[in-house]
Amino acid sequence: AFSAVGSLEGAYFKQFGKTVEFSEQQLVDCDKYSHACNGGLMTNGFIHWMRYAPRDESEYPYHIDPKSKCKEKQTSSNYEELRYGYRVDVGWECLYEALMHGPVSVAIRAENDEFRSYTGGIIDGDACGTDLDHGVTLVGYNADEDYWIVKNSWGEEWGENGYVRIRRGKDKGICGINQQNAQAVYNENEYVDFD
């Protein structure tokens, strides 16, 4: 949910010029194709927002409760439904191009010591693996030192104030970052199919 929300907030800002905080809890509670607190696919979140407009975080706040129920009917949305783009197995060049349109929701391999205990620096080894199990938000890159800048959902105490730097390149990418990604797009003219 956090990864998809990051991409959606970026797309909304690009289209409308307003900073918003959308509700992660809306997806956790209401996206019937995902698995609540046990995760799901970012594309399922985007599909949900195509049917039901996103809710504001202040109206539908995040809380940890595995028994939480969907409250979409009890809240209203001031936002438009979403148009979206979806990319799979596209490689680092296409991720770079997608970043020109805003933040990208990406899947990575996080269930490993290198990622879980990350405190700083650039992850550039094969210790991560490439079996995807976690969604994060790709927010930038450094061309000089050749790494991605990625926002995680584990709080500011983790990594570099909640962010991680991952080396670009390789087939599936370090921690599998090149394998699966999706990006929210509000404007039909912004949709680019990189497949």
Question: Which ranges hold each PLM region?
Answer:
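Catalytic-core signature of thiol
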Residues: A1-D195
